[in-house]
C-alpha cells in the first residue's frame, strides 16, 4: 500500500500555487491578447510595417510562455490526479512512481514561472549596493546596524554572492553609524530589493546596566549597480566632495591618510562614501559610481508612483516605514508586510532570510 496523502497534499499545493500565479499574471487577459496578436500576425499585410510585426512577434513569444505554461500545469495536474487514482485502484507501484515523477516535472515548470514572476524587473539581474544606517538611539541603534550588516553578509555568503565593504563608519562606543556593501552576483538586486525599509529591534540592551528593554531602529536601502553606458547627467557644481581619514576595518592605511571620500549631491541630498581602497582616486571613482546608481534609482522611483519614494532624509528612521520587527526577548521575528514570522531568531540573525525574502517577492512587493 502506498502513502498517498503526501502525494495528494503535493498536488493540492501545486494547484494552489498555479491558481495564485494564474491570477497574478492575469492569465485570462493574456490569453485574450494572445488571440488578438495571433490574428494580427496572420494578416497578409502585417510585414508592410516590419517594426510593428517584430514587436508583435516578441509580444506573442512572451504571452505564449505564460499562457502555455499555465495550460500545461493545469492539464498536467488534472492528468496526475487521474494517474494517482489508477495507481491506487490497481495497487500498481510503477504507476505510483510515474505519478511522483510527473509531479517533479510540474514542480520544476511552476518554479521557473514563479522565478520569472519574482525577477521580472529591468535591473533584477544586476549587482547591488546595500546601505545600512543606524537610527536614533545611540549605541544600541549602532550595535543593531552592525548586527544587520553581519546578517546580510552571512545571507549573501550562503547564496554564493561575493561581497565588498565599500564604507564603514564606526559607532561612538560599539557598532556602526553606517555601512555600504556591494553584493556581486546574478540576481543580487532581484533578491534583495524588497529589503529596503526600517528594521526594528526590541531587546534587553547589553549596554544598559539596568538590563531594561530598548527599541532601536536601523534602515536598509538597496539599489542596483547601473551600467556605465547609462546616461546620468551629473553637474560637478552640484557636488560637495569631502575627504577624510578612514575608520573601521581596512588595514594599515586606516586613519593614516585622508583616502576616504564622501560625495554629496546637493540638489537631492544623496550621499555616497567609499574608504575601502588606499587610493583616494579609486575611492572617489567608486563613490561616483554609487552616486550614479543612486541617482538612477531616484529617477526611476520618481517616474513610478507605485514604487516606494526614496527618502531624502535618512535621519527619519522610526515607526513609519518598518518592514520587519525583531523582538529578541520573545524570540519572535515578524515581517510586517507579509505576516511571515519565526521564533528561530538566531538563525535569522545568522543570515537565514530566504523565507522572508521569498514571501515578499512572491507577494509582488
From Swiss-Prot:
An MF annotation (GO) of this entry: translation release factor activity, codon specific
Superkingdom of source: Bacteria
UniProt keyword Lipoprotein present: no
Record keywords: Cytoplasm, Methylation, Protein biosynthesis
PTM description: Methylated by PrmC. Methylation increases the termination efficiency of RF2.
Modified-residue entries (N5-methylglutamine), positions: 252
Main location: cytoplasm
GO cellular component entries: cytoplasm
Subcellular localization(s) per the UniProt record: Cytoplasm
UniProt GO BP: viral translational frameshifting
Misc remark: The gene for this protein contains a UGA in-frame termination codon after Leu-25; a naturally occurring frameshift enables complete translation of RF-2. This provides a mechanism for the protein to regulate its own production.
Function of the protein: Peptide chain release factor 2 directs the termination of translation in response to the peptide chain termination codons UGA and UAA.
Family of this protein: Belongs to the prokaryotic/mitochondrial release factor family.
HAMAP family named in the record: Rel_fac_2 (MF_00094)
PANTHER family: CLASS I PEPTIDE CHAIN RELEASE FACTOR, PEPTIDE CHAIN RELEASE FACTOR 2
Protein name: Peptide chain release factor 2
Organism: Yersinia pseudotuberculosis serotype O:1b (strain IP 31758)
Gene transcribed to yield this protein: prfB
